[in-house]
Amino acid sequence: MARIFKFFVFLLIVFISNVLLLVESNEGDNSFSSKSIQLSLVSNWGETPSYLEAAEFLHNQDKSLFWKFIEEFNKIDFSTNYSDKIYYESTISLMKSVLSSNTQFLSEFLSIDLAMRTYSPRVETYRQLAISNMKLNNIEHSITTADNKTITLFNSGGWVQIKNKIITDVNEINESLFKDVAVVDDEENEFIRLYDFDHIFPTLANTVSSSSSSPSSIPIVILYVDIKSEFFKLVHPKLKQFSQMGKIKYCLRYVVQESNQKLNLQGYGYELSIKNLEYKVMDDSAIKKDIIIDGVKSKTIINIPNEDVQGFNFHKLQKRKPELTSKLSTFRSYLMAKSQEAKELKVWELKDLGIQSAQKIIQSGDPLRSLEYISQKFPTLSNSLSKITLNESLKSVIESNQKIIPSTTDQTLLLNGRLIDTNELSPIELSRIILEEYEHSTTIQQQGPLSSKTVQDIISAQLPIRIQLLPTKEELELNGGNEPFVSLNNLELDYIYRQWEPKLQSSVLDKPVTSPQDIFIRKNLLTTVIVLDWNNINTFEIIPEIQEMVQGNSLIPTRIQLLFNTKSNNNNNNNNNNNDQNSQTSNFIQGKDLAKVFLTIKNSNLGNRGAFFFITALNYFKKMYIPNELGITRSVLSSSFQAVLQQMGGSVRSLQHALTNTDFDNLLESSNQLIERLELLDTTTSQSTTTTTTTKILPKVFVNGVQVKYSNIDQLSFDLLVSLYDEFDNLKPLFKESILSTTTAQYYETILTSSYWKDNNLPFLKKLNSMISNEKYSHLITNSKNRNQEVDAQNVLKNLLYFRNNENKDEQNLLNLIVIGDFDHYNTRDISLELLRQLEKGELKNCKLTFISNPIDINSVVNTAGNENQILGKLITILKHYGKILTPQLVIGLFEKVQSDPTIIDSFKTMKQIIELSGFDIAANDIWVAQSVNLFKQSSKVCKQYLGIQSTNKSPLSILVNGRIITPPLSYDDAASFIQSDFKLLLEIEMIKAKKTFELLNSDPILKDKSNLKISDLLNKVQSLVGYYYNGNNQLDSNIKRKRIPNSLSISFSHKPPTLSSSSSSSSSNSNDVPLKFLMIINPFNKVSQKLVPMVREFSNKLNIPVDVILNPPVSLSELPLKTYYTYVIKLSSEFNNENVLYNQPLGIATDIPEDRVVTLALDIPSSWLVQPIIAKYDLDNIRLKDLGDEQVLTAVYELENIVIEGSANDMTTDNAPAGLELLLNPISTQTNKTQDTIVMNNFGYYQLKSNPGIWKLTIAPGRSSDIMDMVDHPNQKEKETFVIVPHRLVVIDSLYQSLSSLSVVRKAGQELRPILQPIDEYEKQKEQEKEQKLKQNSSGFFSNLFSSKNDATDSVATHQKKSNLDTIHIFSVASGHLYERFLKIMMLSVVKNTESPIKFWFLKNYLSPAFKEFIPEMAKEYGFQYELVTYKWPWWLRKQTEKQRIIWSYKILFLDVLFPLDVPKIIFVDADQVVRTDLKELWDMDLHGASLGYTPFCDSNKDTEGFRFWKSGYWRQHLAGRSYHISALYVVDLVRFRRLAAGDQLRATYDQLSRDPNSLANLDQDLPNYLQHYVRIHSLPQEWLWCETWCDQESKSKAKTIDLCNNPLTKTPKLENAVRIIDEWTTLDNEAKEFELKIDQSKHHRQIELDHQNQLPNSKPIENIDDILLNLAESQKDLF
């Protein structure tokens, strides 16, 4: 019994011990690590001074402020060597001194830009300009001074460039200025070439374009100078004086001292993804203990950490059995992987995790900070979050919000209603947007001054303009009495809406809409009409969006009706003189036929679902087969129709039946008539289905006749919902007046035929007048960045003579009418005369009227009669000065006299004649008459440059109505009818707006002077600014989009910055009248939110901007939504240490990462950055914080290696992408002298080149490309006659971020039909000729060597010569992580030892460790091979991969045509984990039989893995149709043929289509070429070229030419174990590589220590106060969770 009891106790102890161990192993998910990861990113250029960056900030804001800053800076005494802090504080102080009271806010933005180093690339560009200028002048860095001292030219203070010589002696400058500038310079001279960013001293000659002394006729003098130097103090005043005299054009360029210190950058993030350890990928030598051998640290001893993993202490086991270290390490990794799997949440625990997370955020003391914390640390916090008791009411609120928020919208960021694109948002871009919006708001506020609330109320005021979108009786009769609309749904009858509220509740009608439920009513109260032009391919893009509205998860409370246009605007078929075009377009299906097929399917038993599926199929087949065509071909239509029948069946008989069906002819004709009558289509050229024009026009959408404004198709559902809520509120008065009721039969007709709109002076149009619907504004005043231009503009605008109705002197003059035009033109005078007449009659009420001359051609001096031009325009310019003696009647009289005889205007020879004709009491020699010419030129300049209005022969005049630009058409019958009809209607609309604005201004609490005159003047300015900034087609930036959020959306929480919160109780409200507010709709689990939230929070706290947040998490989850940790690096303040040295080191510090988790690090960087790690002790691909041992911080430093230039090229001759065009990027003023080359892709004409700050020259490469194409200077010119051919284009890289550029090329005469890519038959012929030539040379060499004598020494030389004469074999490979780099070294050794020919290795740089990049040059020297590191930035248009492994796979196949220089003819890809056993020359020379790719088929001989051969069954078997499925571990690419076939374009286009489905392309690098081998042919290599144990039997191993370590899905054995077991020579090669690495470590040790001291990079070790930072982080986060 006692034995049984003891045994039971023993079992219990074992059980408890194992349970405790299991609990301990699973605690990692909730236990925070005390260790952290510290990452920094530095520039590859040297530090730049903060005061120069500040000067560039000012130059960017206002050039006049820049020169004020320079003048003040020149007064500072720099004899003392000041600290960074003194320079910084002096710069900020100096900045404030040159700013006016209205622009002091700029100092805050300066401090932000200094912290972000925004202008450092610009300063670096100046540094490179100065260096290149010295090289250009053949000047060494060192010069001898007058006292025989040798100093560097940079340290001398500077020099002056005059023509082709430089002057360093101050005493010589005066003489040279008088003597050497006598002859005009050629601005193309590279010595004195100027750039757009240059600092040109402002004088009349270079600021007034109309000056008789053109800037190009003034000699250029460039001062290269250190602005702190004594040289600058002496030279600047001299050059300034000469410039003010108009003698020179003075350009100032900085001389910037070179620096070894690098910039610390920010505006990037990094994620830590939990690693999948199914297959062991950690190097067993990666966890190493440094030991000392002869005083040198060496990494050779594997040291397994002293820890328990699932009950085993592998550290102790290693000590007992050191010979089993490798196997112990493998088993340890296996258990670690199982441990990570055990921490996953169950499905039922995941369901409410989204709501629980939102609940935790809202309940936090600082919700915005909690939002950031949870989104960045979610994997660690998910367990705790899942245990929160669910708040059902919060869930209901979020569900209600999501009825409004489109399902495709995870995040939206608005600033004062401005929609901010968050996908590529950087802190620098967000700072620019905030500054722009701040300037807009404050400019409006300062006009009063006004409160920010008044400004926001004016901005948000909406005026619905309704159109009578109903058919006439005739149009109804044409369609058999039916309306010409195609209905998609019926809210009152369709089953899907059965649960909606059936009646309108009175409580809803008595208050504004506050809940989404308010409008979800089962009534057709809100009807949306969408006008679809079947001749416009955008139709096919919008229909899937419409489908989501009526069939998707987010039903929208509106009846949707489609109105079809099938009447083609394309006249090509009737254009008899363009037979080529006719034949080209005949293959395209007409819009009418497409509409008939759609309607045939819709009216069949397939209904909406079938019709929508048909459009989806059209989209798919079009993008698959004709992605670059803008039309639908017959084959695409046929494939789409067949797809419908195959997928859905249905009763539709055939495509031919649908095309010949006449049932819908009357419907389509009726709808065409309605569209034409109401002018619902834009008259501009649309994106036709039969032509290749590219103007994108969005389909028009109306809600109960009110047009919905939306910026793009993706935003339609959201913007439509906002319009539905607005319209619901608009209809409430109709219910109160019993016009509508719950029993109304036809809501739509009743609403559009009601007299309510006209009775209440609300705009109601009988047709969509484009002049009214297309809003465009100019500004009457603005916060211009050009102060001189602002002063000139206000001088003109404040000196205008306004005409008013004298009988109504008490009128408020709410409308300000300014006629701007060419008064030599009949129409300008005609409209002006009629406006004056109607003003005098009292027809134009509450209006004031004035005129500004704006000639069509300012340089035209004389008219057709040979007399002085623009006499009337010049007279009008000076009318203000005679306002007391002029009346409207006098001016009317003048216009009438001129109009009575139009030829009289050309007969005037002097101003005196027109004054006499006018009867004005003005002396001909009056001073203002004498000044009329200059004033006339000034007013014209203001119109063109400030107001943005150009007079042309087609549009000789424009009328500004409170800033709104109206351009009368030349086709009007007469001026009176135009003004009484269209123009009068527009004035009525603008008057309604003005009255609302007047009320708001009158009630403003800040505005003191509220007299009619003051408010009238204020209103005119405010209306123009609001329209210009917010409501119209913004002239500042047409890409700016604005969005309104319905009031019914519930705000989850509001964030008030600390400054605002602390001062909220202050009595002084004015000081906190912040004109800005963020609104953020955010899904906490979206990857964009991980960087967006910290960015918004940082700017909010820095600039005191409040933030409203609407949380938008998924309401139900089935898997973990975020599996990565994330850290974003942003710091908007500059800090200094105790020595007053700039200590602004933006760092990405990741804390709270479980120590036992294996994570992989991936950078999240801007699209135009290429970076590389330069310091990393540990494997960043396999990070486990426990492996740090005693170290607390894992440090990594990356470097910004290149700034990428991305562009889109267009062949203007054919309007297509010039695919295959070769481009060169040559450095002019940059750090590097290396030329970059690339080819243009067919995909969007995309090209990519690497650069750095400086100036580059983009050219077409010599050869076939330059023989065919020329570069064009003006990419927007469409007329070939205006093309300006240029030899190159200058590219200036002076910012951290580069936007997409455009490049236009045109074909040379006679080259219109010649293909850019050499045809394959030409290529084959050329190849044969080269082969024959080579054979001749080889045979000649053989006979000459046969009779030559040799000795041992010459034998060696000959052997080397023989090898060098052979073709270089180019080997490409990729690797990531220390294990695969170890494999890579072994692969390289196996290649070098077995291949006789010269070898050049190409490695993908992106993921190589710093250690490997330091090692590879030494290995290349030792083993005699070449190598090069290559990279390519993922293009913006190509669907991105997010998982690192899939990104690496992508690089193996997607960019082969552009990854390597154009002179590389062929590459062989060899996997890193492969060993080569043969001479690769055999594979290099192998005939690919016309294919561009050679791959080895998968082995079929190992029957154990038969069940894993997926390509033998199902989809793959059917798709391959007897072709082989190939393995991607080894392949050869004929790059020349590959490019000739545009194979890269086909691979990318197919990838982009297939990758839409996340379940496709599971093995991306392998599946893609195999899938596409029908089009990009693959030559199957003999089987022996690749052997791997997983798929091949053992008998075939002896023939293997390469052996690959394929993963085995049966055993999942780690690769290291397989390598030792399978490959006999692997251990020998591994040891050789290790021994060589040890040898290199020892030889470099002392030299490396010395270099580390000399060139120490910032952040190469943990910063001194890292403990303080971590402590502060822990303290700040303690209350977040």
Curated annotation (Swiss-Prot):
Q: Which gene encodes it?
A: ggtA
Q: Which organism is it from?
A: Dictyostelium discoideum
* Keywords, in A-Z order: Endoplasmic reticulum, Glycoprotein, Glycosyltransferase, Signal, Transferase
Name the pathway.
Answer: Protein modification; protein glycosylation
Q: What does this protein do?
A: Recognizes glycoproteins with minor folding defects. Reglucosylates single N-glycans near the misfolded part of the protein, thus providing quality control for protein folding in the endoplasmic reticulum.
Where in the cell is the protein located?
Endoplasmic reticulum lumen; Endoplasmic reticulum-Golgi intermediate compartment
Choose any GO biological process term that the UniProt entry carries and state it. Answer: protein N-linked glycosylation via asparagine
What protein am I looking at? Probable UDP-glucose:glycoprotein glucosyltransferase A
Q: Which SUPFAM superfamilies match?
A: Nucleotide-diphospho-sugar transferases
Q: Which GO terms describe its molecular function?
A: UDP-glucose:glycoprotein glucosyltransferase activity; unfolded protein binding
Leader sequence residues? 1-25
Cite the record's Low complexity compositional bias ranges: 569-579
Which Enzyme Commission number(s) are listed?
2.4.1.-
**What are the boundaries of the region Disordered?**
566-586
Query: Gene3D superfamilies this protein is in?
Result: Spore Coat Polysaccharide Biosynthesis Protein SpsA, Chain A (3.90.550.10)
Q: Does the keyword Iron apply?
A: no
